[in-house]
Amino acid sequence: MRWLGHASFYLETPAGVRLVTDPYGPQVSPAAPVVTADVVTISHEHFDHNYLDNIKGNPVIWRGLTPEGDWAKIDVNCKDIHAYTVPTYHDDAAGAKRGKNAVFVLEIGNLRLAHLGDLGHVLNDEQIEKIGRIDVLMIPVGGYFTINATQAWQVVEALKPRVVLPMHYLVPGMQGFPIAGVDEFTAGRANVRRFGEGQIDLKAENLPQETEVWVLAASQPRI
């Protein structure tokens, strides 16, 4: 698994499925990654989450929203991946400011991952129940367009994942995003690990029993 920057991750499953979440393009960073994928998930239809020109191959696209901007009903399988979506909003005003957002839950073998997209509010009890047990949580922490660091910790405490992968925060090279860096999220926390290489190998038996934050270096490869 690699963090490609912003809200985009690259995963390769044991069955060889290459999945990319929320791809972005040069409007976000001139060094936007070019990757080959079998599956692409898109949490919502904003330019920094649905840029497909840098995705090679002939991937299946799982879009969390319909062309009309409503939630799509995603409950699909691709080899060893089962994916479903949970309806949420891009803001704290029931979508009045920025529309709707889809959380993607990915079941891969005995691992459960959740990609929160551009979540704009803390989760309610129904959403928490639908998301369910999560091993690895990909969560926005930069604020402004999404939940901020304080709200992100509320979500973490509600879901109780084993690993938290912060995303959607300011990094060098980003263009025109008034969002905070990751340090606001990690400040004062002892359970933080930093990975310089931007790539991790996820196995259920190797994950911590208590929640840890894993900060990945953004990897912008050509793969």
Summary of predicted features, one role per range:
Residues 11-14, 76-79, 106-109:
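Active-site beta-strand termini and strand-to-loop segments that position acidic
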Residues 8-71, 84-101, 119-130:
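Pre-active-site segment of Zn-dependent metallo-hydrolases
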Residues 1-14, 18, 66-67, 206-208, ...:
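Zn-dependent metallo-beta-lactamase
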